[in-house]
Regions:
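N-terminal secretory signal peptides that target proteins for export/translocation
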Residues: 1-11
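Sec-dependent N-terminal signal peptides
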Residues: 12-19, 56
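Hydrophobic core
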Residues: 19-25
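Sec/Tat signal peptide C-region and signal peptidase I cleavage site
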Residues: 26-31
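Transmembrane beta-barrel domains of Gram-negative outer membranes and organellar outer membranes
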Residues: 32-169, 177-181, 186-197, 201-205, ...
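A mid-sequence, solvent-exposed acidic-amphipathic segment
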Residues: 192-239
Length: 313
């Protein structure tokens, strides 16, 4: 009897332990897991707030069509750019709708740091030489530093070497200079759309008459719309607040195609010139009258100096 009693007591305890393991322990473990998940989620949110994520690829290259974008060439990277503009399509079949004529520019852009870019170039239009620097002042970011916009400053100097002044006038070398200063304000709204505004001032060292101002103000607007991983639609428009006589606002629409280290840009524009002084203040054709140029830009990057990970820009 005593043995039977002991077995019954042990059996009841064993049954209680089984029930505890089956019903109570999983519940407690689940509750602990939920608490752990909550703690991990809170930790992730805390780390995200303490970390700053810089927004990248607002635009796919440093030139939208004619104008600069917010993007910089990376540190130690050389960007070779070839820009080509054919004649206007309204010249007809005799000039093969503009393909018999061409204006081009070749440029070299180099990233000194991830914030500072410098560049030089030569254009056939007015035989212009140009140089510029671009500095990224603010970078769009989220997290610890929440910055809704990216902001850059661009200063460009252009020297016109074309000898076309009428006799008996003689211009000094400094009279052939133009300067452009720009502030670029850009935002990447999502992976499919980016927008930028570009307030601009172009200065002429000399103008034909005293009735024409030396300084010209304009505002540019540009966008990028993503179609696929490697294809984007682009557009830019520069509105002149005070126009050079006989000129119109520059409008360009295009498509960008990425292929490895190359970016191909194909577009239509009413601007013949490629530098800021040329396409902003010297566009003399209108879209509605067929003064449209087909053009393309080719960009190829080369890593000249591999930056050290310890370098802060």
């Amino acid at each position: 009897m005593a043995v039977t009693f002991i077995f019954k007591a042990v059996g009841k305890q064993f049954t209680a332990m089984v029930l505890f393991c089956v019903f109570i322990l999983p519940y407690k473990a689940l509750a602990q897991n939920v608490d752990l998940f909550k703690m991990q989620d809170e930790q992730d949110k805390k780390e995200a707030k303490e970390k700053t994520d810089i927004t990248t690829s607002i635009f796919k290259t440093t030139r939208l069509v004619n104008g600069q974008t917010i993007e910089n060439t990376g540190q130690g990277v050389l960007d070779v750019k070839i820009s080509h503009r054919f004649g206007t399509v309204n010249t007809g079949s005799y000039n093969f709708y503009g393909l018999d004529q061409a204006t081009m520019r070749i440029g070299l852009d180099y990233g000194v740091t991830n914030r500072l870019e410098i560049g030089i170039g030569r254009s056939t239009y007015n035989k212009e030489f140009d140089g510029f620097f671009k500095y990224r002042i603010l970078r769009q970011s989220t997290g610890k530093i929440n910055m809704p916009l990216s902001v850059s400053w661009v200063s460009t100097g252009i020297w016109r070497s074309l000898h076309d002044q009428p006799e008996p006038y003689t211009l000094n070398s400094s009279d052939h200079f133009y300067f452009a200063n720009q502030v670029i304000l850009a935002r990447k709204f999502n992976d499919y759309f980016s927008l930028q505004l570009v307030p601009t001032m172009v200065h002429y060292n000399i103008v034909p008459t005293q009735y024409i101002k030396n300084d010209f103000l304009s505002t540019g607007i540009g966008f990028r719309g993503r179609i696929s991983k490697r294809v984007n639609l682009t557009g830019e428009y520069y509105y002149q607040l005070n126009r050079y006589p006989g000129t119109y606002n520059s409008l360009s629409l295009g498509v960008n195609i990425e292929t490895g280290g190359h970016v191909f840009q194909f577009f239509l524009t009413n601007s013949t010139g490629i530098n800021e002084s040329s396409f902003i203040t010297q566009t003399n054709g209108q879209w509605e009258k067929g003064y449209i140029h087909f053009g393309f830009n080719i960009s190829r990057v080369f890593t000249m100096v591999k930056p050290k990970s310890t370098i802060k820009n």
